[in-house]
Amino acid sequence: MICGMTYYQICWYFLIYSFGGWALEVVYHAVACGKVINRGFLNGPVCPVYGFGVLSVFAMMNTFQGSGYQLNDSMIFLFGVILATAVELIAGWLLDVCFHARWWDYSNKPLNFHGYICLEFSLIWGVAILLVVKVFQSFVEHHTSAHAPSIVGWMVVAILYALYLDRKSVV
């Protein structure tokens, strides 16, 4: 276990929230720009930055709750703002340095930091994390725990390997 989550849960949550983030990005871009495009770094339907962002919040929450702290909605929102923004900053910088490309640019937004992050989206991430924790996660937990890890585990490994191969095609 890592931060209160099994490897099985970590893989499932990463895949589910990476896909959910990709879907959110595609819908947001379709509404904002009027056309549907794949907004992900990879060719497939995932945005790993969302998976890492959600997992970082779950890890922090589990660590705090394991120490006996009760987290209220304000604390969950704050964790979402800070951790998701940190993940977005690191991911944006790494993608820029490694591939000399930007998958997002907040330079035109007020209170941005080098275009990688901005206050507006940091607050949106806080609300999104609050929704994930309070609304979606119980559904995700129920449906992922209903399957035997040994059977579905191989599916998860296959999907993660496909993501690895997808990464190789982008690089």
Regions found by a protein language model. Give the residues of each.
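Aromatic-rich, lipid-facing transmembrane alpha helices and their immediate juxtamembrane interface loops
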Residues: 1-171
